[in-house]
């Protein structure tokens, strides 16, 4: 399917840019090296987004702006590298079953954490890293916002984009999260709602949510 799409694109364009899911969460970027061999005579640019979900769309917007000036491949890659460092997120994990089943949390520790109803905070900055735990959802959100701020300094620089990524389907639950987050960030900006990608919930399980912030 990808080969067919590329063939069609190269009939219309001299250069094709592919922005992939973060290589820390998927092998898709590495697999493109095989495809690039088939297009040696074409101008194909493959860039690791180091991001997920709506964060990739934010990067696409930046790339489209730069493409108006006919940038070099190196300028495109540099832009994505710089902007991806501003897009940081993390997951608040309520259900530890998938983490225990996948061996990412030892069974004994997992049983204790479940008994105490602990929420795990998992940051992603290109890959997943366990950062903290707390029994309280509001405190978990506060801690995650601090963790993100330590990386991209959104409190100082301001927020360019922010989103809640979730597979939750209860609208009132999502709206409650949105209201709580709006109060905590203390900035006037629309909070988008987007999907929690499969590469995330494959590790942390279902019925969780993440916060993704792009700093200015």
Curated annotation (Swiss-Prot):
GO-annotated molecular function: lipid binding
Record PROSITE patterns: DEGV
Domain DegV: 1-215
Keywords from the named record: Lipid-binding
Keyword Plastid: no
The keyword Ubl conjugation appears for this protein: no
Residues that coordinate or bind hexadecanoate: 26
Function: May bind long-chain fatty acids, such as palmitate, and may play a role in lipid transport or fatty acid metabolism.
NCBIfam families, per database record: DegV (TIGR00762)
Protein name: DegV domain-containing protein UU190
Species this chain originates from: Ureaplasma parvum serovar 3 (strain ATCC 700970)
């Amino acid at each position: 399917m990808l080969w067919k799409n590329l063939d069609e694109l190269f009939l219309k364009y001299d250069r094709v840019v592919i922005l992939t899911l973060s290589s820390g969460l998927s092998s898709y970027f590495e697999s493109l090296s095989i495809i690039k061999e088939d297009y040696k005579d074409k101008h194909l640019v493959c860039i690791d987004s180091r991001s997920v979900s709506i964060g990739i769309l934010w990067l696409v917007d930046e790339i489209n702006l730069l493409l108006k000036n006919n940038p070099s491949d190196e300028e495109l890659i540099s832009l994505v590298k710089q902007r991806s460092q501003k897009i940081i997120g993390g997951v608040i994990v309520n259900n530890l079953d998938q983490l225990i089943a996948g061996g990412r949390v030892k069974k004994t520790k997992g049983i204790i954490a479940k008994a105490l109803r602990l929420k795990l905070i998992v940051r992603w900055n290109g890959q997943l890293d366990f950062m903290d735990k707390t029994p309280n959802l509001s405190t978990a959100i506060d801690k995650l916002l601090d963790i993100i701020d330590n990386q991209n300094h959104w409190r100082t620089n301001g927020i360019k984009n922010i989103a809640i990524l979730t597979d939750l389907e209860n609208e009132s639950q999502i709206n409650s999260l949105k209201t709580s987050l709006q109060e905590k960030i203390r900035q006037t900006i629309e909070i988008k709602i987007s999907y929690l990608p499969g590469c995330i919930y494959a590790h942390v399980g279902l019925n969780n949510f993440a916060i993704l912030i792009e700093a200015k």
